[in-house]
């Protein structure tokens, strides 16, 4: 009997309930700890995301991936480890060998035909190992530091891409941009509904830090199933540290202030997961 990949299973369950799964990026070990603890507070599954930038920061995938996998294993709720925006196919293979739960392969910089070909190869590789695959058709706004809220995914092209590649989830451009520090973006809800009707797999919203709570709920109600958030949580983490050090510049033990960032991310993770599941 073939077991359905964990990410595909929890996304399908959320899609049936018109809810969404939160996927939050790991930067430091404390992020993984905070996100898993926040998920336990909310009683909801969560996805720990590791990007190529994170891999470069930690000078390799194994240190942060293995630590995240151990945190996930010890959690009292379902916590998955996911590789986010991976362009390096060798890194995908390393992730498969390490035992990650899912991969977002990003071939959006390639030509359409090459994107389809390489995404199909990655999907076949990962599915053989019981790992789910997310992909992207064309760039979501904000790549290379350029916000492009006008970018939109065509439903017919999205449906054809999913059929050709066999991916389990699709990241779509519906008005958000990566790395936004203000929550002022808006989602094209009508387009989300059209994409949900056209595409037979769960839809993924990248760049969700730029959305208010109302916009997040609207995106979920319109058909988004996986909500990626990073910058918003990083801002909370950083502001917590800065506030402490502004008052106590004499403190040199990093545990005394890094734990405040961890606590802030934990609290907001729990709140966001409850919002997405409402």
Residue spans of the language-model regions?
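Alpha/beta enzyme core
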Residues: 5-17, 29-54, 61-78, 86-198, ...
């Amino acid at each position: 009997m073939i077991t359905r990949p964990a990410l595909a299973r929890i996304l399908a369950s959320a899609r049936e309930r018109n809810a969404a799964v939160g996927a939050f990026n790991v930067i430091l070990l404390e992020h993984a700890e905070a996100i898993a603890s926040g998920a336990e507070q909310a009683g909801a599954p969560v996805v720990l995301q590791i990007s190529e930038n994170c891999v470069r920061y930690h000078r390799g995938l194994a240190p942060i991936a293995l630590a995240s996998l151990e945190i996930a294993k010890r959690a009292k709720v379902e916590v998955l480890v996911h590789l986010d925006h991976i362009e390096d196919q060798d890194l995908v293979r390393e992730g498969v060998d390490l035992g990650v739960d899912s991969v977002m392969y990003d071939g959006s910089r390639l030509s359409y035909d090459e994107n389809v070909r390489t995404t199909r190869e990655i999907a076949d590789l990962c599915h053989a190992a019981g790992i789910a695959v997310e992909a992207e058709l064309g760039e979501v706004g904000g790549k290379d530091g350029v916000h492009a809220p006008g970018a939109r995914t065509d439903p017919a092209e999205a449906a054809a891409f999913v059929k050709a590649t066999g991916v389990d989830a699709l990241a779509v451009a519906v008005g958000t941009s990566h790395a936004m520090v203000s929550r002022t973006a808006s989602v094209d809800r009508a387009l989300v509904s059209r994409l949900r009707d056209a595409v037979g797999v769960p839809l993924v919203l990248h760049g969700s830090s730029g959305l208010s709570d109302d916009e997040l709920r609207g995106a979920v109600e319109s058909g988004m199933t996986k909500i990626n958030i990073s910058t918003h949580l990083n801002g909370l983490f950083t502001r917590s540290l800065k506030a402490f050090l502004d008052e106590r510049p004499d403190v040199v033990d990093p545990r005394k202030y890094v734990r405040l960032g961890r606590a802030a991310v934990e609290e907001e993770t729990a709140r966001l997961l409850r919002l997405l599941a409402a």
